[in-house]
Every structure is written in C-alpha cells, then in structure tokens.
C-alpha cells in the first residue's frame, strides 16, 4: 500500500462515547465534521480505564494515564495501583525514602507536613495514601500536620466533608489538619502564581485568607461563601502557625503536572515566580513520585519512575523520521512528557509547539480556549512534511470539568470547526489521521444520581476513527495501548518488541 504522509494522531481530550441524551455535550453540539467522519470512515471504540490502562478495576482513566499508555504502545502499570499494592502488602511502611524522611525528622525534632488531595478520585492522589503515610510517620513518633487539598473536580463538586470525615475517622492520633485549600489554588499547572501564592502562604506561613476552628468548619464556611470544593480559599485551622526550621514536607500526590508549581515554591533553590519571603530550611522534602528532573535536584522520591523503552516518539526517531507535537498549555505536558514515557527532552527530529491557554478564571468563560491557534498550527504542520503529528485539543476535557453543559457544547463545536480545516489540509497532503480520545468526560455533564453538575472523568468507551486510511481498511475495538502500533502500521514501520499493543487496522 502507499504510505500516507503525514500520519496524524488527533486526541480530543475528554470526548467519550455515550448514548444520546440531555447531558451529552458531543451529542447536543453541532459537529458536522466529526459526524461525517463517524458516518463515512472506519470506526471502533477503545477502553480507557481500569486494568486496560494499568489502573485498578473500575478506576476511571485520566490524561496522564491515557497519554502514557498511548505513547508506550503497551499497558503501563500506573503509580496508583503500585502504591495501593504497597499499602496492602505492607511494603509502603518500609519504603526506604519514607524511612529516611522519618529518620531525618527524628534527628531534627521537626514535624512532618503532609500535603495531598483529599478524595478517592484516584487521578492525582488518594485519601487512603494520606492515611497510610500519617500512620507510618505517627508510628515513628513524629508529629504530623496535614495540608488538605479539597477536590470537587475528579469527584462530586461538594463532597469534601465526606472525605474529611473519612480522614478524621482513620487518622492516627497526634496528627492534625493544618490547612484546607481548594485544588484551584494548590494544584495549578498553568503558571497562575497568584493562586499558588495563596496556598503557599497558608501552608508555609500559616497565613491564609481565612481561619477556622476545624477543617470541617473551613469547608462549611467556604460553602457559606458559595465556594465549591475545587475553589475553597486557603484556610488555616486554628493552632497552626506555619512550617518551622527543621520540619519536613511530604507531597502525597502521585501525578506530576499539578504538584510541580507548589513544590517549586516550597523547595526550589532561587525560586522567583513570586515573593515567598524567607523560607524555612526544611530537613527533608519527599515526593510520592518524581515530579520532574528539576524537582529531583532538591527532593527525594518514594516511588521513582520506571523507564519505558521504545515509546512511539523514541521509535519513530530511531527510524530517522520527523515528528511534531502540539497542544495548548493545559495539555502540553501530555503530548510531550507523558507521551514520551516521562522523558522531558524531545527526541531527535521532534518539534513542539504550545499555544498559551487563555488567562480566564475557568474555561467555561472561554470554551473555545486556544483551539483556533492549535488548528492554525496543526494545518501548518500537516503541510510541513512531518512523518508523524500528535495533537491534543484540550477543550472537551477542560470545559467538561467546569460542569457547565452549554459551555461544553460550545467547546465541542470549537474543536469540530478546527477539525474541518484539519481534514481538508490532510486530504490535500495525502495523509491519514486517527481521531480518538484519552478518556471520557464531556459526554456526561449531569450527575445521574444527584442531578447536579458532573465534573469528573467517566469510564465510558471512547470513539476511534481513521481518516484517509488505505482503501478497504477497517478498525477493530481495542485499548489505548493499541494506538501506537496502529500509527506505526500506517507509517509502514514495524513496532518494537517492547510494544505489546496490537494494530487496530483490519
């Protein structure tokens, strides 16, 4: 067969497959391009959750997991399952890095400050991991202060009290909640340093916008101010007055992208994104995982990353091919760092472009986000002679997370409008494109149980379609790990033996 060029992977982030209905944004949106693709091109569906992407059964997928599996071309055992298993078999409590952290604090007499996302969403962190870490440290006699980050995004928007109750019921004696802050502030990933500084001031200085007698009061007071869990303003619980010299800090989130900024503020030498004031000298700074090569310079790690050999990008580079990666800020790490198996440096012949995500408080205020700029660069790349292009449209996921159905519909329409230009350019170039998603989200915008907004990912299958493929080709159902082998097959390249995924082409 004639090898198409370019071969393209277009990821519609958070665009799941579901029955038509009043909460299904892709169904309600006017999407003539995608409708035509789904009607006239080979299509199938992919699994994006649970063991098929290296997660525990029933655990919804997410963008980090999705892009890691896509780029690896094999099912990658993810950190959530690894940590869960370690807690279950007891090896977590004997973890070398954790024991060294405890030993350092026993030496200095300092307290351990733990920070984590208090929910069971399992995307960035898990309440059971927090409880296990508290137990390990309290069993060693070290005082514990917990900096609780409320979720409301990977779980229901007003569920924080349930998780705080679970936390306080299971928390080892002698541990106290020091601060309560919504993830909007503590887990930014878009250089909104004004948000991060509010979380920093509460955690490090003990100086929040608000104070409360208890963690429960902090959340109830936030609800009184009409703040949902994600947006709880930094609140200091009475009795906490900041991190002291000789204390230690342990970040329990196991996903890198939304932990990096707050950790830079707390530990990076020469940090200058905002004025932190004098920072207390920490005796130890520990992370559940590796957050970046830069963070490794001043942090230790409980669960270092495992090398993924011969990812899609690495293998394509080894064949002397040129490739291009494209996404706006919110999803840029996913098409670069995560797709390349946790490797930050581009491969030889790998070019990248990142339009900036719009500076709005929440993306329902600008549901088109930077899709027009992504599309313009996408079309330019198709015409530029690359062999492989990987692009991510952030809109369906980022706007889906706001819970605003009308905005999610507009987000889908903005992406479809861009796809129209892309398909035309692809046809002119003689290329082929796989269109799919990394997980579901915007196809379920109303919680079927509560009737309120649904802001989390789903476990729905996602669509996959082949545009401009070889004549007579069909697609079979599969999982995300099958996408890299499919792209390689379209490029006329053998897949490396490490890739255990199977081409979807039939």
Curated annotation (Swiss-Prot):
<comment type="pathway">
    <text>Carbohydrate degradation; glycolysis; pyruvate from D-glyceraldehyde 3-phosphate: step 3/5.</text>
</comment>
<feature type="binding site">
    <location>
        <position position="439"/>
    </location>
    <ligand>
        <name>Mn(2+) 2</name>
    </ligand>
</feature>
<comment type="function">
    <text>Catalyzes the interconversion of 2-phosphoglycerate and 3-phosphoglycerate.</text>
</comment>
<dbReference type="InterPro" id="IPR011258">
    <property type="entry name" value="BPG-indep_PGM_N"/>
</dbReference>
<feature type="binding site">
    <location>
        <begin position="255"/>
        <end position="258"/>
    </location>
    <ligand>
        <name>substrate</name>
    </ligand>
</feature>
<dbReference type="InterPro" id="IPR006124">
    <property type="entry name" value="Metalloenzyme"/>
</dbReference>
<keyword id="KW-0324">Glycolysis</keyword>
<protein>
    <recommendedName>
        <fullName>2,3-bisphosphoglycerate-independent phosphoglycerate mutase</fullName>
        <ecNumber>5.4.2.12</ecNumber>
    </recommendedName>
</protein>
<keyword id="KW-0464">Manganese</keyword>
<feature type="binding site">
    <location>
        <position position="331"/>
    </location>
    <ligand>
        <name>substrate</name>
    </ligand>
</feature>
<feature type="binding site">
    <location>
        <position position="13"/>
    </location>
    <ligand>
        <name>Mn(2+) 2</name>
    </ligand>
</feature>
<dbReference type="GO" id="GO:0004619">
    <property type="term" value="F:phosphoglycerate mutase activity"/>
</dbReference>
<dbReference type="InterPro" id="IPR005995">
    <property type="entry name" value="Pgm_bpd_ind"/>
</dbReference>
<dbReference type="Pfam" id="PF06415">
    <property type="entry name" value="iPGM_N"/>
</dbReference>
<feature type="binding site">
    <location>
        <position position="397"/>
    </location>
    <ligand>
        <name>Mn(2+) 1</name>
    </ligand>
</feature>
<comment type="subunit">
    <text>Monomer.</text>
</comment>
<feature type="binding site">
    <location>
        <begin position="153"/>
        <end position="154"/>
    </location>
    <ligand>
        <name>substrate</name>
    </ligand>
</feature>
<feature type="binding site">
    <location>
        <position position="438"/>
    </location>
    <ligand>
        <name>Mn(2+) 2</name>
    </ligand>
</feature>
<dbReference type="GO" id="GO:0006007">
    <property type="term" value="P:glucose catabolic process"/>
</dbReference>
<dbReference type="GO" id="GO:0005829">
    <property type="term" value="C:cytosol"/>
</dbReference>
<dbReference type="InterPro" id="IPR017850">
    <property type="entry name" value="Alkaline_phosphatase_core_sf"/>
</dbReference>
<feature type="binding site">
    <location>
        <position position="63"/>
    </location>
    <ligand>
        <name>Mn(2+) 2</name>
    </ligand>
</feature>
<feature type="binding site">
    <location>
        <position position="457"/>
    </location>
    <ligand>
        <name>Mn(2+) 1</name>
    </ligand>
</feature>
<feature type="binding site">
    <location>
        <position position="189"/>
    </location>
    <ligand>
        <name>substrate</name>
    </ligand>
</feature>
<feature type="active site" description="Phosphoserine intermediate">
    <location>
        <position position="63"/>
    </location>
</feature>
<dbReference type="GO" id="GO:0030145">
    <property type="term" value="F:manganese ion binding"/>
</dbReference>
<dbReference type="GO" id="GO:0006096">
    <property type="term" value="P:glycolytic process"/>
</dbReference>
<dbReference type="InterPro" id="IPR036646">
    <property type="entry name" value="PGAM_B_sf"/>
</dbReference>
<feature type="binding site">
    <location>
        <position position="124"/>
    </location>
    <ligand>
        <name>substrate</name>
    </ligand>
</feature>
<keyword id="KW-0479">Metal-binding</keyword>
<comment type="similarity">
    <text>Belongs to the BPG-independent phosphoglycerate mutase family.</text>
</comment>
<keyword id="KW-0413">Isomerase</keyword>
<feature type="binding site">
    <location>
        <position position="183"/>
    </location>
    <ligand>
        <name>substrate</name>
    </ligand>
</feature>
<feature type="binding site">
    <location>
        <position position="401"/>
    </location>
    <ligand>
        <name>Mn(2+) 1</name>
    </ligand>
</feature>
<dbReference type="Pfam" id="PF01676">
    <property type="entry name" value="Metalloenzyme"/>
</dbReference>
């Amino acid at each position: 067969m004639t090898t198409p060029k370019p071969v393209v992977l277009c990821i519609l982030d958070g665009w799941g497959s579901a029955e038509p209905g009043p909460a299904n944004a892709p169904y309600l949106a006017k999407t003539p391009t995608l409708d035509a693709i789904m009607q006239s091109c080979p299509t199938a569906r992919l699994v994006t959750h649970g063991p098929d992407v290296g997660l525990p059964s029933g655990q919804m997928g997410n963008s980090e997991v999705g892009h890691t599996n896509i780029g690896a071309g094999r099912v990658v055992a993810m950190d959530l399952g690894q940590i869960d298993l370690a807690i279950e078999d007891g090896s977590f409590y004997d973890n070398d890095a954790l024991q060294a952290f405890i030993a350092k604090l026993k030496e200095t007499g300092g307290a351990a400050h733990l920070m984590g996302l208090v929910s069971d969403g399992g995307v960035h962190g898990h309440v059971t991991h927090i409880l296990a870490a508290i137990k390990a440290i309290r069993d060693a006699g070290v005082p514990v202060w917990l900096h609780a980050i409320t979720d409301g995004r990977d779980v229901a928007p007003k569920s924080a009290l349930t998780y705080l109750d679970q936390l306080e019921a299971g928390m080892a004696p002698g541990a106290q909640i020091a601060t309560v802050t919504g993830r909007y502030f503590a887990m930014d990933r878009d250089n909104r340093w004004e948000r991060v500084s509010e979380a920093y001031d509460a955690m490090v200085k003990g100086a929040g916008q608000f104070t409360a007698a208890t963690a429960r009061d902090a959340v109830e007071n936030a609800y009184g101010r009409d703040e949902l869990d994600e947006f709880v303003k930094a609140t200091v619980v009475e009795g906490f007055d900041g991190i002291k010299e000789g204390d230690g800090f342990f970040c329990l989130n196991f996903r890198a992208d939304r932990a990096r900024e707050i950790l830079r503020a707390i530990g990076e030498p020469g940090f200058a994104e905002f004025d932190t004031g004098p920072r207390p000298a920490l005796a130890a700074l520990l992370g559940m995982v590796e957050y970046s090569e830069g963070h490794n310079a001043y942090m230790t790690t409980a669960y270092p990353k495992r090398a993924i050999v011969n990812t899609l990008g690495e293998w394509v580079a080894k064949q002397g091919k040129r490739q291009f990666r494209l996404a706006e800020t919110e999803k840029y790490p996913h098409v670069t760092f995560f797709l390349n198996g946790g490797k930050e440096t581009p491969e030889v012949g790998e070019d990248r472009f990142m339009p900036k995500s719009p500076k709005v408080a929440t993306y329902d205020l600008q549901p088109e986000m930077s899709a027009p700029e992504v599309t313009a660069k996408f079309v330019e790349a198709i015409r530029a002679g690359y062999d492989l292009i990987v692009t991510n449209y952030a809109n369906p996921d980022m706007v889906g997370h706001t819970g605003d159905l009308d905005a999610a519909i507009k987000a889908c329409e903005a992406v479809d409008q861009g796809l129209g230009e892309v398909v035309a350019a692809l046809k002119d170039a003689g290329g082929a494109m796989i269109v799919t998603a990394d997980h579901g989200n915007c196809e379920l915008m109303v919680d079927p149980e509560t009737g309120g907004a649904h802001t989390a990912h789903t476990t729905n299958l996602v669509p996959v379609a082949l545009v401009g493929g070889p004549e007579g080709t069909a697609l079979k159902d599969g999982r995300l790990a099958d996408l890299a082998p499919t792209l390689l097959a379209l490029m006329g390249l053998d897949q490396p033996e490490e890739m255990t995924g199977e081409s979807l082409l039939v």
